[in-house]
């Protein structure tokens, strides 16, 4: 597992990987996105998880608000989703809301928090982060299944044992080992640790929290197999609420 990272090497890894990574396009209809956001709000309510009031703003309420809302826009807070370019959100996709985040170029905040919804057997593909360390927390609902590999020197899947901590308890797994997080359990994922996750079949959708160092989804996701990330959107109806990728078009 990586323990230190050379800044210059990281910079070129970001550039090279993202040029390749962005070749795969995710495309989703706005009507599908609206439906997913509405159903997510209903699930958050059932789980008694409260979002900030601005999560429910209509698109027109954002007009001309950049100066007062730059902490939201610049730090990419808000609604976010992807089908990773597979055009089958229920099989391979993720919807989330970034509640707080820093921006190394614009503020001093060194941490981030997300809340995510993971459906039964809905996969977030195998990936690691060069820079970010994170805790993934099962906040309630079903069980979260996580598959783990160390990365090797060439950023492939290593066959070495995987050492992780779950709620402060050290555990050692075989390469490709699986952990199941029940509600209340969490895992710490260090930089360079490959992971994929999905909701366990038959247990219901999962409310998943993430607490981490500053999050940058434009340059700090190293997927084992290249995927799409921010979807191109077919505007078949008006947005109910904006995605983080919509801000530049509305503010």
Model-identified regions with their sequence ranges:
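His/acidic/aromatic-lined binding-pocket segments of jelly-roll/cupin-type domains
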Residues: 114-116, 134-138, 145, 178-179, ...
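Glycine- and acidic-residue-biased ligand/ion/polar-headgroup-sensing regions
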Residues: 120, 133-134, 138-154
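Short acidic-glycine-tyrosine-enriched beta hairpin
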Residues: 157-191
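Conserved metal-binding segment of the jelly-roll/cupin
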Residues: 179-201, 208-213
């Amino acid at each position: 597992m990586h323990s230190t990272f050379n800044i210059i090497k990281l910079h070129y890894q970001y550039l090279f990987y993202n040029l390749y990574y962005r070749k795969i396009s995710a495309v989703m209809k706005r009507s599908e996105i609206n439906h997913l956001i509405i159903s997510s709000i209903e699930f958050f309510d059932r789980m008694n998880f409260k979002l900030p009031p601005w999560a429910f703003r209509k698109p027109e309420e954002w007009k001309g608000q950049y100066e007062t809302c730059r902490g939201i826009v610049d730090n990419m807070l808000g609604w976010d989703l992807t089908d990773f370019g597979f055009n089958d959100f229920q099989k391979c996709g993720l919807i989330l809301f970034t509640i707080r985040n820093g921006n190394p170029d614009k503020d001093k905040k060194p941490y981030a928090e997300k809340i995510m919804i993971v459906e039964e057997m809905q996969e977030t593909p195998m990936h690691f982060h060069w820079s970010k360390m994170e805790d993934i927390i099962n906040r309630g609902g079903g069980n979260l299944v996580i598959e783990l590999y160390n990365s090797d020197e060439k950023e492939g899947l290593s066959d070495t044992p995987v050492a992780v901590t779950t709620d402060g308890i050290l555990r050692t797994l075989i390469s490709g080992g699986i952990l199941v997080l029940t509600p209340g359990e969490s895992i710490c994922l260090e930089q360079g640790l490959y992971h994929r996750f999905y909701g366990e079949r038959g247990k219901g959708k999962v409310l998943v929290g993430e607490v981490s160092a500053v999050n940058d989804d434009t340059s700090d996701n190293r997927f084992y197999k290249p995927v799409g990330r921010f979807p191109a959107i077919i505007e078949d109806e008006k947005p109910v609420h904006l995605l983080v990728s919509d801000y530049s078009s509305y503010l």
